[in-house]
Amino acid sequence: MKKLSILAAFITGAIMVQAQIDSSAKNLSKFEKIPSFNMYIVPDSTSFSNKNLKTNKSLVIMFFSPDCEHCQKETRELLAYKNELKNIQILMASPSSYGMVKQFYEEYNLASMPNIKLGNDVNYALGSIYQLRTFPSIFVYDRTGKLAKAFVGNIGVPAILEALK
């Protein structure tokens, strides 16, 4: 079982090393609206889909890996800007195992931000819609559900807040 876990972690890491989102305007137009998705969120494996999102609220989708240093830094920054982000829905999705995602959730005390939903992107379904190659990758949607901005890499919360103005 331990060998299987190590193999799964290695495969996940290999997938994540294949970097870069194609951020050309032509390709970003595919993501103008929030796509349909379903994932299992921590801490209780509850199913969460695009139908569970609140309407008329901005949304930030952050694709991450628990072992990515840039993702860890971005997460610490989200926590530091807790008050500024309290009215923004944040969906953090990872292709890593549910156990790794749950450990990340607990380690960063993400329960302290109820507007964050963090979960396992089963079979990399949502990540493949966005054709992800880099973590973190961040997609910012305005209150109407239209894509405001897409970011690749650690960009900081001020850039996210600016995209929502």
Which residue stretches match the model-derived regions?
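Bacterial Sec-dependent N-terminal signal peptides
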Residues: M1-A25
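N-terminal "domain-start" segment that seeds a small globular fold
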Residues: Q20-K51
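Short loop/turn microsegments at loop-to-beta-strand junctions
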Residues: P35, S58-L59, F135-P136
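Hydrophobic beta-strand positions
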Residues: M39-Y40, F63, V140
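Short active-site neighborhood of thiol/selenol oxidoreductases, capturing the structured segment around
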Residues: S49-Q72, L78
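Structural microenvironment flanking redox-active thiols in thiol-disulfide oxidoreductases
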Residues: Q72-L110, A125-S128
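Short, internal strand/loop/helix patches
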Residues: Y108-F139
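Thiol-/selenol-based redox modules, centered on thioredoxin-like
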Residues: T134, V140-K165
